């Protein structure tokens, strides 16, 4: 069964059948229904990939992301899929593990697969990797603040504002010495934003705050082992802030095993809030980063570019999403209500 046979059985032209599949709004309802009835009767499905090769579009986009197992990553994926699905596109997922070579190999593969566009999350590549050896001639959006990746469509979360709100809260509780436990596979973006937010909060509060930075695997096990090392060295900080919720959960377990009380002996907070943060004891003060909205924003930027090829690809388009601080119990908050949102 092919499109010509469908046209013959429906008593219409091949062009009409093509319009039913591609631009149904341009076909009279009774004609459209007649064609669709024939396709249903014969279980006919258009070969979208072959059609894409003919028209120069495959209705497929690629999402290159360092990891897919975290709550944050899953929300980005969900946001991208929501927008892509509404557009009738499928999404190819490529897990790069934060490895430049893996990411580059995936990009080469996506070029041969002729995807219509690419979303890269926290890319570790530089602009020369695209224009010289790869020459990717397709719309690309970057999620993250990497200024060297060559993307002119960028979406990212305002980590400086997130750090400012968190540190401001910590300073009101009397904390002055803050340690950041960072993902050992990421660049220094969060650490830089954390330091900038800390300094701004200190200036506003007219007090001096100090930041020290540690690295660990972005997992519960990574947080657990990192805190064990701190205990063994006798370097338990006043406040420990983690880059993600999983590290914080691991630290909470390590503190309990080591008979260290949170928040009495050490305050604990994290970026990238998840549902787990509100149900553990003590509930963890965290910064909610709207990852699903971030994925949706990136996908919308990408599809705007795919659908409007008259846009100047060299004009920077930037979308910045704002955080929300969720004040709970792990930093010493004594407010009687369950949660405060700032």
List the model feature ranges, each with a label.
Residues 1, 22, 26, 30, ...:
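Residues at secondary-structure transition points
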Residues 1-59, 342:
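N-terminal helix-turn-helix DNA-binding module of bacterial transcription factors
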Residues 3, 14, 32, 46, ...:
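A general structural signal for well-ordered alpha-helical segments in protein cores
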Residues 14, 32, 58, 77, ...:
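ATP/adenylate-binding site constellation spanning eukaryotic-like Ser/Thr protein kinases
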Residues 14-19, 53-69, 169, 177-184:
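Short beta-strand segments enriched in small/hydrophobic residues
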Residues 41, 82-87, 111, 135-142, ...:
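Bacterial carbohydrate/catabolite-sensing allosteric modules
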Residues 41-47, 101, 121-123, 252:
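Short gly/ser/thr-rich secondary-structure transition/capping motifs
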Residues 56-168, 172, 231-232:
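Alpha-helical recognition/docking segments in bacterial nutrient-uptake
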């Amino acid at each position: 069964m092919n499109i010509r046979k469908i046209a013959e059985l429906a008593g219409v032209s091949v062009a009409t059948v093509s319009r039913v599949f591609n631009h149904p709004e341009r076909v009279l309802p009774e004609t459209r229904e007649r064609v669709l009835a024939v396709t249903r009767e014969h279980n006919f499905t258009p070969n979208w990939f072959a059609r894409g090769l003919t028209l120069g579009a495959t209705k497929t986009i690629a999402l290159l992301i360092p990891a897919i197992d975290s709550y944050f990553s899953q929300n980005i994926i969900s946001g991208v899929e929501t927008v892509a699905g509404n557009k009738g596109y499928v999404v190819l997922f490529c897990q790069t593990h934060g490895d430049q070579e893996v990411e580059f190999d995936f990009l080469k593969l996506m070029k041969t697969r002729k995807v219509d566009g690419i979303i890269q999350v926290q890319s570790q590549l530089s602009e020369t990797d695209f224009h010289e050896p790869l020459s990717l001639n397709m719309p690309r959006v970057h999620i993250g603040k990497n200024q060297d990746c060559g993307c002119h469509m960028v979406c990212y979360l305002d980590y400086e504002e997130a750090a400012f709100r968190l540190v401001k809260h910590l300073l009101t509780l009397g904390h002055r010495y803050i340690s950041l436990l960072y993902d050992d596979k990421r660049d220094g973006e969060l650490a830089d934003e954390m330091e900038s937010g800390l300094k701004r909060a200190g200036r506003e509060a007219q007090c001096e705050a100090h930041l020290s930075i540690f690295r660990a695997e972005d997992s519960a096990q990574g947080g657990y082992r990192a805190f064990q090392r701190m205990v063994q060295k006798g370097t338990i900080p006043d406040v420990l802030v983690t880059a993600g919720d999983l590290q914080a959960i691991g630290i909470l377990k390590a503190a309990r095993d080591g008979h260290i009380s949170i928040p009495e002996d050490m305050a604990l907070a994290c970026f990238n809030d998840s549902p787990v943060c509100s149900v553990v004891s003590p509930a963890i003060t965290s910064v909610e980063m709207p990852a699903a909205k971030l994925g949706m924003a990136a996908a919308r930027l990408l599809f705007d570019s795919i659908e409007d090829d008259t846009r100047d690809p060299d004009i920077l388009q930037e979308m910045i999403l704002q955080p929300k601080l969720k004040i709970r119990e792990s930093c010493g908050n004594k407010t009687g209500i369950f949660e405060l949102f700032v």
